[in-house]
């Protein structure tokens, strides 16, 4: 990426992300949301395993956001790899999805629905080095893809202009060797700058994949923004390119080489690089909440991953 104008945009995005991340973690209201998730939802539920059980997923989502935003702050402002925060954020993201799915499968779905963007965290699981979690999350999401009435699976992808969820799906399918084609699924070449990476994902040549990965990184950088036409619309992913890291992890899992690619995106922050798999943390709150939640909703939650 040598375009001077692009470098200016890149630096501006980095500065914006630094301000956003630091501002978020210092706002008292966000701390109150995190603490409220524990005090107002999880603690009462742990006392009787019934109170506000339908809100357990939303509480887990708030806690996941808390940890992930702290990880972003550490990443862009302290330039440190936020392993503890990142692993906790990933773990709570995973169980939010599983618990929400369990409620969606119940007689009272309580307003929970599959979001089109929920496929992106499958890449996050791979970036963390948690393939079992990635498989489980993807299977959970595909369950809802066809079942959910009026869900995003029944809407042409162009309607949303979202690239990354479909990149996540195509990466997953290539990794798992699935040839299933979903309704309204875009062709690889419709995903523009991500197409070469998808096409060379399992190429035996590490150099061929590396060249394609650099093109995808260019496309990622160009697409960071909040407008409808932007490719990477979620700020948390601007400097944590989970779709690119997932592609590298898939090659590792397939026993294929990944060469070191020089690119400003990969060098800007610690989360721009693929790291060794993180250990799955043991979290005391989850260890108490999840078994009770599974029991409270009738056992429709498999706690084994």
Task: Outline where the language-model segments fall.
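Residue-level signal for functionally critical sites in structured catalytic/ligand-binding pockets
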Residues: 191, 220, 224, 236, ...
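Solvent-exposed interaction surfaces and binding hotspots enriched for charged
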Residues: 3-4
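Non-catalytic carbohydrate-binding regions of carbohydrate-active enzymes
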Residues: 204-232, 270-280
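Acidic, Ser/Thr-rich low-complexity linear motifs
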Residues: 152-156, 225-237
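C-terminal structured domains
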Residues: 230-305
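Eukaryote-skewed repeat-based solenoidal scaffolds used as protein-protein interaction platforms
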Residues: 8-221
